[in-house]
């Protein structure tokens, strides 16, 4: 069974979807949580290259058709606004990619994630930023939820199209991928600590 999506095949939005996740958000807010981050593992299947929300082995490229990058940005803006309007939950952060550098995600549909190259990430983030500015959304776009801290400053188990993320996204010399002056993109980078927090002697 596929995960529910607010966006429907006819282009309309069904705000009765994803009740379980939204209930968790409301319960968290009631209990004092005051910062919220939205994330996703895939663009809507209507926009993907394979019609699925999982990778099917494109050598780690983004599962998003070239003609749907702007549609993807518009979808994210609509969801950010829609959840705030319907549930009074304001997302402080949006993480549009999950472990894009994960080498395990290049082969096939073995685990959720958003395989992508840094150029694909930069293109998408610039368009998301543009849409957020147009719609007056101040949610910050975080990048890039690395699968391993080491991918941020090396090519650990990945390659140059995906590694060295700090340098690539925040050094002005990285012309194709620089996001340091992009509206709504804070000067921070996110990642997961798998394999780097144990054993302690490492």
Ranges and model annotations:
Residues 69, 81, 111-202:
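Noncatalytic carbohydrate-binding groove/subsite architecture in carbohydrate-active enzymes
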């Amino acid at each position: 069974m596929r995960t529910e999506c607010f966006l429907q095949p006819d282009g309309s939005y069904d705000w009765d979807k994803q009740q379980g996740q939204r209930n968790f958000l409301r319960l968290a807010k009631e209990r004092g949580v005051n910062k919220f981050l939205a994330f996703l593992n895939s663009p809507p299947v209507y926009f993907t290259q394979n019609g699925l929300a999982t990778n099917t082995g494109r050598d780690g490229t983004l599962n998003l058709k070239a003609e749907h990058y702007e549609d993807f940005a518009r979808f994210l803006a609509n969801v950010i606004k829609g959840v705030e309007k319907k549930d009074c939950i304001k997302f402080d952060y949006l993480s549009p990619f999950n472990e894009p550098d994960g080498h395990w995600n290049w082969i096939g549909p073995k685990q959720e994630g958003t395989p992508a190259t840094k150029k694909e990430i930069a293109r998408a983030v610039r368009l998301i930023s543009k849409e957020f500015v147009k719609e007056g959304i101040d949610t910050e776009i975080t990048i890039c939820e690395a699968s391993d801290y080491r991918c941020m400053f090396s090519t650990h188990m990945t390659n140059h199209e995906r590694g060295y993320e700090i340098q690539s996204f925040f050094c002005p010399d990285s012309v194709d991928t620089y996001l340091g002056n992009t509206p709504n993109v804070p000067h921070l980078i996110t990642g997961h600590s798998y394999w780097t927090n144990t054993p302690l002697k490492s």
